[in-house]
A protein has these predicted regions:
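Helix-loop-helix hairpin linking two adjacent transmembrane segments in secondary transporters
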Residues: 145-193
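Helix-breaking motifs and short loop linkers at transmembrane-helix boundaries and internal kinks
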Residues: 49, 81, 102-107, 136, ...
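A late C-terminal transmembrane helix in Major Facilitator Superfamily
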Residues: 336-372, 379
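Helix-to-loop junctions at the C-terminal end of transmembrane segments
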Residues: 69-81, 271-283, 367
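Conserved MFS/SLC helix-loop-helix module at the cytosolic interface between two early adjacent transmembrane helices
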Residues: 68-106
Length: 408
């Protein structure tokens, strides 16, 4: 074992782009694991004999676990470094996927899903913080490239569901195939040269860290960035999770709605690529405001038109515009400087998942008790609030923040 560890240390991958490639790949497979649940909700509810409201509670509980691990990851990164936290997150995802393979009872499903979400929480913060820190001079483009992995994973997930339905494979076995890439990525991590944690982290250093984090979290500019993330990810996750359930109310079959979902997620990939080009020429805030405004218009149009073809076209246009806006928000938050990448990443991700905890449950409750159109009502309201918040955020307030953070 010592020889293997020594060999890994000697042969570490040192390429400048290796961290970006690893982050992209890890976020790709992490996204598939995270987004596979939404399209198979109709199968899970039948297989485990539970209602949509109960499923919404499970998703909210899992998202709460994700929220806690996200908050913890921001602090743990400062102490243990990127490699150990990424390794731990990957192991949790591996364990969660393995548990979901054997989820033939509701108890096993809840435990395995919670473990999976905890691993995702660690990896979302650690991988994006790593990219933001390592490529700070080109942060907007690098963050967008890394997050394209998330978007591609969201495309692959519904396609896997359609394939599993076509070959009559149980939804549990999808997670067996998702566990394999994590084993490979854990092995690659051993060879990857990644910054470590702080050595001899003292109690005074921990106190200073909490002091700085408190000031950053309470600053109006950072707080508004967190609120944008809160609203935006809630919109994205509720729309994606309850997508097939919404189309089932229109008498569209699961395999067809999964393909439509794949079209939507393909549009989000296209949107990420477009933003990757536009971010060089347009200020982050202006691009964010335009994207959210157009997203509202196209989602409202998709809701108003009853023709399925027209509805799919507007959903595609919605996907192009709604994609990549968390990356822009994160890039705006990083204007504070590379020193505080970990805490900004942790705050924005925690805010995102806090919104998902509430709105996933609300979407499930309203879909079960009122109408499956409820998710669109919720998302349209969130987009409208987003437009207002983005319009009032002001980057100039940041110039005073560095004076307030008085730590060594």
């Amino acid at each position: 074992m010592k020889k293997i560890i020594h060999f890994a240390r000697e042969k570490r991958i040192k390429s400048y782009r290796s961290i970006l490639v690893f982050s992209f790949t890890q976020r790709l497979f992490m996204s598939i694991s995270m987004n596979i649940i939404g399209p198979v909700i109709p199968l899970i509810t039948v297989d485990l004999d539970i209602g949509l409201e109960y499923m919404g509670r499970i998703i909210s509980f899992g998202t709460f676990a994700l929220l806690i691990s996200t908050i913890a990851a921001g602090f743990l990164l400062e102490i243990f470094g990127f490699k150990k936290i990424i390794f731990t997150g990957a192991v949790f995802i591996l364990a969660g996927c393995t548990g979901l393979v054997f989820s033939y009872t509701i108890v096993i499903f809840i435990i395995a899903y919670t473990i999976l979400q905890m691993g995702i929480g660690m990896l979302t913060v650690a991988t994006l913080s790593l990219v933001g820190n390592h490529y700070f001079k080109n942060k907007s483009k690098s963050i967008l490239i890394s997050n394209i992995g998330l978007t591609v994973g969201a495309v692959v997930a519904p396609l896997l569901v359609s394939l599993s339905v076509y070959v009559n494979m149980g939804w549990q076995f999808i997670f067996f195939y998702l566990a394999i890439p994590q084993v490979i990525l854990i092995a690659v991590l051993l060879f990857l040269k990644v910054p470590g944690g702080r050595k001899n982290f003292s109690a005074a250093g921990l106190k200073n860290l909490f002091h700085a984090n408190r000031i950053i979290a309470s600053h109006p500019y950072i707080a508004l960035c967190c609120f944008i993330a809160f609203l935006y990810i809630s919109t994205m996750q509720t729309f994606y999770t309850w997508f097939t359930s919404y189309f089932s109310s229109l008498n569209v079959s699961l395999d067809t709605s999964s393909l439509i979902l794949a079209i939507y997620t393909t549009a989000t990939v296209a949107g990420m690529l477009v933003k990757n080009y536009m971010v060089k020429h347009v200020e982050d805030k202006k691009l964010l405001l335009a994207s959210i405004s157009l997203s509202f218009v196209f989602l409202l149009s998709a809701f108003l038109f009853s023709n399925l073809t027209v509805k799919v076209i507007f959903i595609f246009l919605f996907g192009v515009n709604v994609a990549g806006n968390f990356s822009l928000t994160f890039s705006m938050g990083l204007n504070i400087g590379p020193r505080f990448t970990n805490i900004v990443s942790s705050l924005l991700h925690a805010s995102s998942y806090l919104g998902v905890v509430f709105f996933q449950y609300l979407s499930g409750y309203m879909s079960e008790n009122f109408s499956k159109n409820s998710v669109l009502y919720i998302d349209l309201a969130l987009l409208l609030i987003l437009i207002i918040v983005i319009a009032i955020i002001n980057k100039r307030e940041l110039k005073y923040l560095s004076r307030e953070i008085n730590i060594a």
